[in-house]
Amino acid sequence: MQPAILARNLIKQFGGLTAVDGVSLEVRPAEIYGLVGPDGAGKTTTLRMLSSIMTPTSGTAEIAGYDVQTQSGQVKDNIAYMSQRFGLYEDLSVWENVNFYADLYGVPARGRKERIEDLLDFSSMRPFKGRRAGALSGGMKQKLQLVCALVHTPKVLLLDEPTNGVDPVSRRDFWRILYRLLARDVAILVSTAYLDEAERCNRVGLLSNGSLLAQGSPAEIKRLMKGAIVSIRSSQARRVQTLMEESGSYEDVNTFGDTVHLVTQDEAAAGQQAKVLLESEGLPFDEISRQEPSLEDVFVRVLKETGEAGVRPWSSESRSGFHDQAAGLTAPGRPAVEVEDLTRRFGSFTAVNRVSFSVPAGQIFGFLGPNGAGKSTVIRMLCGVLEPSEGRGEVLGFDIARQPEKIKEHIGYMSQRFSLYDDLTVVENIEFYGGIYSLAGKRLEERKAWAMEMTGLADHARSMTRVLSSGWKQRLAMACSILHEPPVIFLDEPTSGVDPVSRRRFWDLISAMAEAGVTVFVTTHYMEEAEYCDRLALIYRGNIVAMGTPTELKTRVMREAILDIHCLRPFEVMDSIAELPGVREVALFGSGLHAVVRDPEEAGQRIRQEFERLDVPLERMEQVVPSMEDVFVALIEETDRRESGQGEG
């Protein structure tokens, strides 16, 4: 079978910068190829060259047998390209948007209606065909854009980080659609910042500084991992990570949610030493065991070994500075943030409904919820930007309705879309925010020096902000938001679209801030990041449906058990397993499946029998502690069932 996508030694230069350096890859029909790499690695540039939007400096590429440079018209007839920015018309309905794209692609009138209806059914969007696109959630917009891209029946689908900023429920739906496309022999090339998504691809390429460092199946990529991984599960994973790093006994230490991975050449000795260290410090842990490497383990390790880990770690000097700046900023025993029955309506629509919670000083409080659940609305009210319709709230003792200007003086705020000025240099952005916060003279110079040290951008002080990668912009935006040393900081999806290395280092800083007494209020769609919070609240349709520590939510919320299932092609068996008695739901999870079941022993037996009937080898199946993603999805679905009157029966 001929490749549907074929690239040979693709190079793209912008002046003296080589953005893509000799990339060669191929993707066959009915195959998903995942392109992963740090910010600025060249993923988007590669996709743009393959879609004939951008001309390569040298090298060749073909789409469905057509040359991307000399036959761009035929290339565009055979591809669907979905960029990171929505290409939707928000004042048009779902149906009108799809019909408009059908016009653009020249889809014949005969059979068009049936084609659109098929795609709407295919994507579960038919119930919303009359809804205005601007009124859709982020996840539904992603699905609509995909439907628009598929209306002309392309042979190749190019997706540039399609699930960035999308909640886990919507991500699961999106990937179900992608797997259905494989049955139609579509070749899919997807760039992603989610390494668990890359686990689901047939093949993966690791791109860094424009070059492919490795490519192959996920299993082949994992074999690049040198050394064994010892896994420690703990409710205080961040403290465990710090302890293990300070011991200097391990080649690498990384945290994944509530689990710490130690890279070592001597598995037995490493596990025993870790146990001694944990017991000597009195840190809780559930288990210490050998762990098969994940793609994220390999991703981080390969980048470090090749010296291409991108943004360097926060320096100890910049992190320790928080111990001075946060001291004594919140009254002892008083919550830093407190709200009671907080409500916000927009006309007849209630965006936030009688929300109540309090956040002690120095705590990391995570706010989770699907797109459009009300997270950003709550943050805007707490920041004094939006007045509540009802209820009360205080930040540092200041009333959010009566003293919004006082609140703004004492908080830091970092939005989803980094509030930076692209036409200013790095240092000019810092100076601009220093002026907003009334910093001047020696104090401004001290804070500028601190910000440059903290971000690691000293060598890029005069660079235009627009040329920075997302990881660098993230650091600069954070530095600007805390330049005035606020005791409370609000972070609204601060790591959306940022690569795993940058995300991990960003959370190092958040932890250091909290240890210094800074209160951090953060929203996120990365369920792994939710594990790093001291407490969590899940908001859905404007209501808080659960609140507690990550451990409490994982052990007390779910009434059913989780079976972790691994086989060669999980997407081919998931629908069959989902129809078995006693199985409520089956979803893709990393490289395998998670099945939600009432009786794990009985359901497990039926699942084994189903694998035998399908003649598919079952690699392994075991009951596991629910992940935060499992809990998140279960709470959303339970709320939906309750509100639809189906209950639990």
Regions found by a protein language model. Give the residues of each.
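ABC-family P-loop ATPase nucleotide-binding domain
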Residues: 1-11, 272, 276, 280-281, ...
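Conserved short beta-strand edge segments in small beta-sheet-based binding/regulatory domains
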Residues: 282-292, 616-625
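Conserved protein kinase catalytic domain
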Residues: 76, 120, 222, 241, ...
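ABC transporter nucleotide-binding domain
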Residues: 176-265, 292, 509-522, 527-598
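Short amphipathic alpha-helices in soluble, non-transmembrane regions
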Residues: 243-245, 273-279, 576-578, 606-611
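Non-catalytic alpha-helical coupling and interface elements of nucleotide-dependent molecular machines
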Residues: 103-106, 226, 249, 279, ...
